[in-house]
């Protein structure tokens, strides 16, 4: 196409894709690999609680035929649907005792599923290999099999002339502007002293966002006006992350467990509920064998129920290795009620 050719017509097509992951724990798995061909079926599951499209997983610990008798076979079966066929991709893997993905196998194409039709892998993993590595794959004799399903739904096409150009969300403009006030210390009216570092800020913004700052400024002695307000027990990096959230509603540096932990403590102290939610989400995503016990204590201390639930689930899933850590043993001495 010539670069100077005028575009007179255009359009776009949107393909709806819904994804979800199902985790299936099979207890007392070892006796299933005994040379006898048997079928294990998971509970019925769906994308949403009332979804009319329902599925189940099928496992054959000793394969489905002579070709696959040394392997474990796994399949995804469509049990019910309002309209057939259902088009979907699928991906299977085993979750190890360390919480890692292993033997990830996926369909490279979108497949058509009719009711009661199943698809998957005859030769998923060697049965003897699973049995010979029980600490890694069968902690407490439990196999954790995961399946990610991507359902391809409706296809929508629309001509370009019917599309209203996207307008930038004005809330983003506001947070960008407020962030600039903070980053460049523009028109500030107070000074906060944190571990010897001075930070210029705006009383009105701090008071509007944090009830603790509001009370602090309301009761500030008149003779202290104009003098720095000292902030105790906060690291400057943690304080900057908290202040960035106060001005912009964002906290982009919560990837590390230690930072998210310290920022959660600060957010709780200064009554920043939105920041507590961001920290809780980051800590849920960063759960590991090493920090699970510490995270459970933290969740209980700051009354974060979602984080507490996720930590308990993670610990239950990896009990054999978590229970060997020094953090777990320490927690059992100081906070035994958390798992009682």
UniProtKB/Swiss-Prot annotation:
Residues 188-255 form the BTB domain. Residues 19-149 form the MATH domain. GO terms for biological process: protein catabolic process. Gene3D superfamilies: 6.10.250.3030, 6.20.250.50, Apoptosis, Tumor Necrosis Factor Receptor Associated Protein 2, Chain A, Potassium Channel Kv1.1, Chain A. InterPro entries: BTB/POZ_dom (IPR000210), MATH/TRAF_dom (IPR002083), SKP1/BTB/POZ_sf (IPR011333), TRAF-like (IPR008974). Pfam families: BTB, MATH_2. It comes from the Eukaryota. Belongs to the Tdpoz family. This is TD and POZ domain-containing protein 5. It comes from Mus musculus. The lineage of its organism: Eukaryota, Metazoa, Chordata, Craniata, Vertebrata.
């Amino acid at each position: 196409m010539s670069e100077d050719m005028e575009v007179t017509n255009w359009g776009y097509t949107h393909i709806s894709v819904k994804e979800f992951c199902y985790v299936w724990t099979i207890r007392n798995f070892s006796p299933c690999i005994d040379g006898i061909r048997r079928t294990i079926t998971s509970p019925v599951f769906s994308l949403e609680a009332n979804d009319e499209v329902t599925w189940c997983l099928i496992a054959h610990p000793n394969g489905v035929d002579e070709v696959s008798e040394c392997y474990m076979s796994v399949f995804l079966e469509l049990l019910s649907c309002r309209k057939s066929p259902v088009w979907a991709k699928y991906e299977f893997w085993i979750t190890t005792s360390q919480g890692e993905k292993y033997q990830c196998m996926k369909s490279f194409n979108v497949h058509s599923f009719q009711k009661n039709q199943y698809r998957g892998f005859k030769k998923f993993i060697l049965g003897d290999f699973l049995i010979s590595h029980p600490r890694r794959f069968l902690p407490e004799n439990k196999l954790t099999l995961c399946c990610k399903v991507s359902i391809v739904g409706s296809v929508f096409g629309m001509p370009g002339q019917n599309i209203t150009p996207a307008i930038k969300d004005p809330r983003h403009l506001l947070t960008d502007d407020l962030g600039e006030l903070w980053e460049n210390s523009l028109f500030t009216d107070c000074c906060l002293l944190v571990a010897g570092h001075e930070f210029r800020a705006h009383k009105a913004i701090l008071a509007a966002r944090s009830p603790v700052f509001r009370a602090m400024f309301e009761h500030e002695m008149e003779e202290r006006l104009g003098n720095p307000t000292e902030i105790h027990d906060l690291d400057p990096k943690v304080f900057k992350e908290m202040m960035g959230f106060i001005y912009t509603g964002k906290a982009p540096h919560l990837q590390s467990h230690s930072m998210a932990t310290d920022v959660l403590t600060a957010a709780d102290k200064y009554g920043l509920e939105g920041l507590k939610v961001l920290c809780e989400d980051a800590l849920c995503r960063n759960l590991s064998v090493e920090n699970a016990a510490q995270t459970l204590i933290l969740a209980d201390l700051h009354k974060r129920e979602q984080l507490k639930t996720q930590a308990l689930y993670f610990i239950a899933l990896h009990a054999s290795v978590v229970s060997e850590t020094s953090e777990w043993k320490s927690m059992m001495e100081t906070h035994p009620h958390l798992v009682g």
